[in-house]
Structure formats: C-alpha cells, structure tokens
Amino acid sequence: MLNADLKQQLKQLLELMEGNVEFVASLGSDEKSKELKELLTEISDMSPRLSLSEKSLKRTPSFSVNRPGEETGVTFAGIPLGHEFNSLVLAILQVSGRAPKEKQSIIDQIKNLEGSFHFETFISLTCQKCPDVVQALNLMSVINPNITHSMIDGAVFREESENIMAVPAVFLNGEEFGNGRMTIQDILSKLGSTADASEFENKEPYDVLIVGGGPASGSAAIYTARKGLRTGIVADRIGGQVNDTAGIENFITVKETTGSEFSSNLAAHIDQYDIDAMTGIRATDIEKTDEAIKVTLENGAVLESKTVIIATGAGWRKLNIPGEEQLINKGVAFCPHCDGPLFENKDVAVIGGGNSGVEAAIDLAGIVNHVTLFEFASELKADNVLQDRLRSLSNVDIKTNAKTTEVVGEDHVTGIRYEDMSTGEEHLLNLDGIFVQIGLLPNTSWLKDAVELNERGEIVIDRNNNTNVPGIFAAGDVTDQKNKQIIISMGAGANAALNAFDYIIRN
C-alpha cells in the first residue's frame, strides 16, 4: 500500500526505534480490514522490532500500538494513511521508547494528571488540523498510563460519526471535549493543568519579542537573530493560519507545497538560530513603560523587551447572522479540506465568491451531492481561471447579489435563508452544511487600546511597519496592508525586523 519512496523513508525512520513494538489488530472479513492487514503486514516486515498479532477490540477494523505485554492506550480505528500516516509513525517511535520532542515541563504536566482519561478523536484523512490533536493525545497516552486515545476515521465508522460535522472532534470519557485544532498545551489547559508562570520569571529582557507564529513572525525572528539581537517568539503554534491551508502554489521558487509542510519547514528554519520560541502560549496584554515594553501572557507571566513586533495574523471571519454561532461545528464549517468528507453526497453552500470561496466550491463539488455558492456582490471576485473551472461543474449553482440572512436548524444545519438583492425576495434553501469563506478577521482583540486600529480591527502601520507607539511594530495579516498573502507577510516581517534593529541602534 506504500509507494517505494515512502517505504524507503519509513525504513530509515524505523531504525530510530529503541525497543520492540507490537501491532494488535482487530480484523474482520470486510475490505477495509483486508487493507489494514496489508498495511500493518507491510510495515511489520520492514523492521525486526515490529510484530503483528490479532485480537478483538472495540472497533473493527482497528489496531493498538503496544509494547510487548504492555498496552499503551494508543489505538487507530481505520487506516491511518493520508495526513494521519505521520501520526502512526510517531506513535511507533514513541511507544518504542524514543524520547518526545517536548519540553520537560510539558511532560511533567502530563505525568502529574490524576484520574482516568479515555479520549476518542474523530478525524478525516484529508484534515490538516487532525494530526496535531491525534499526535498530542497519543503522546499523552504513552506518557501517562491513566490516559488512552483512539483515533477514529469517520469515513470508516459512519454510524458513529453521523452527527459529527466538523473534525477533529474530541470526546473525553464519552462526553464532547473539544473541536478543531488543539495543541498539547490547549488540551492540558482544558484539563485544568496550565504552564507554571515561574518558567518565564527568570528570562532576561529581549531585544526583539515577536508575538505570533506565522510567516511574518518567522521571517522577522530569523532576520533579527541574524543581526545578533536577542530574539523571542510567543505563539500558539508555529505556522499560524498557514497550518490550515491545503495547497500553496504561489510561494515563488517552491512549485507546490502544503500548509503543514510549509509550517514544519518554517519551524525547522527558526530552530537553526538562537531564537527563544515559546509555543502553546498566548499574549493577553501589551504595555510600554519607561523601562521596557511589557507583554503579559495568559498564565500571568510578564516578558520584557526593547521592541515588540506584533504578528498575530488573522482567523476566519464569520457571517454574524442568526443561527450561525450556535451551529458552528454542527453544519457551519470553515475548512472544506477538513470537514468536506463529512458531507459526502449531501447538499452544501459556500459563502464567498473570492478565490478561497471558489476553490472551496470546486473541491467540495467532487465530494458532495450539490454545491450552491453565494456571493454578496453582483459578480464573483475570484481569478478567471477559477471561475471557468467552477462554471464547468454540473453540480454547482452560483447565486450573486445574494445576502445571507439566517442559518436555519435546531441541533444541526437544515437550511439557509437569503435575500435576492436584485428583487428583494427572500428564499429558503434546504441543505446540510454551510462553508463560510468570506475572508479573515485580525487577531487584535487582546491589544485593547494599546495601538491604533482601523475600523476593521487591523493594526495601522506606516511603510516601515511602525505602529503609533514607538518601539512597537506590526507585520502580516494583522495589519492594514491591503493584500494578504504568505509571501507578502514574510516580506513585511523582514521589513519590521530591519526597522526594529534600526530603532534599537538609534535609541
């Protein structure tokens, strides 16, 4: 089931195993069970440290990744290919005894959790957010014997996942725990275990502290580190919103990549420099004093720096119409690549006629029964090549001059109301899902009145990426720069870094 290149890469990774690992598989006579057995046999044959046995488990087909004679609590229900293949490889290495690449403070938090935690995560193999959650919970299961985790492919276990309309969907001890991307720190926080503020108390002041972890942040950090400045990053995750991007084909010199691969490469590049990257933590306040610029973190710790570059990016913009908020993850979705497979053979709408909306409609048309694309303006704003592709599809309708007014449904989406602005008539369209693609909302709510914002909530900057507060710079999608592109954000991050350096030597 694995191509030659992947088998060669896997063989090299399996050489890093430090102990024996046993696949314990629950298999039936169905086609998926045959595929799973083929995959596990193929992998087992690649290392003498791997073995395969069979046993009845809660779900079929599924398998656990165990040490000989010891259950680790790590289970995959379905066939972990696609984006989840890396989750399987990591699980093998970690169960074998390979040390995880996590801070000791995080490992200690996991070890100290008290109680029994049985996690189940519903995923789709096309979901780019899902592996982060699966890998975090697998690691927690390996570290703490009171934790178990099962990854469940919703496409294989359709009855169980029938009412799940957004992935990853995490359940703890049978109750809903969370939806969407979560870091290991997010999970620990939801369990009541937070990073100790004392970890940050003895940090020396920075020359440049960058808040955010996306392309602008990474670019800024590398530029300031290369200038010899003491540089820190405070971020939820390296890569930011790019992690949720499927394909990237307009980053010059890189013909094609994915958001996950881009973010991984960005993290690796940052690691090559003396940069203090503090991930899994968010800033909640910023204040300039006579002595320094102070950034307060969500755990109460305060970091000081001569300059700060704000690069917190942006998140999905919502419709802000009745019914939307209460039906998010219950039919209202924002990521077609993650959640699209959950709407197979169903009717959906895409809101937004820009590149993102049209690309989403094109992708969904290959999965769902029918797509209706709504655009508020009189014509679509997407590139012509995308519009031509969209109009060639037989299961897509396009409605322009359409103002969406209500998401309809009780416990899940059943329809959408919209107004035809050319006639003033209101309509109800019955459907099962709504994908909102109307742009981004800057992540500036934490700033309060610290720097000047425009009417859209974006940070106002000048050509040198200065804000209205000396020493505080901003770059990327969080600012009022007109065009929001990865390559533009990286240039803006570099520009902010060079001007922060200039500010330091002049002050």
Curated annotation (Swiss-Prot):
Cofactor: FAD
EC number(s) on file: 1.8.1.-
Record carries keyword Flavoprotein: yes
Gene Ontology molecular function, alphabetical: flavin adenine dinucleotide binding; NAD binding; NADH-dependent peroxiredoxin activity; oxidoreductase activity, acting on a sulfur group of donors, NAD(P) as acceptor
PROSITE patterns with a match to the protein in the record: GLUTAREDOXIN_2, PYRIDINE_REDOX_2
GO biological process: response to reactive oxygen species
Subunit structure comment from the entry: Homodimer.
Function: Serves to protect the cell against DNA damage by alkyl hydroperoxides. It can use either NADH or NADPH as electron donor for direct reduction of redox dyes or of alkyl hydroperoxides when combined with the AhpC protein.
Extra remark: The active site is a redox-active disulfide bond.
Entry protein name: Alkyl hydroperoxide reductase subunit F
Biological source species: Staphylococcus aureus (strain Mu50 / ATCC 700699)
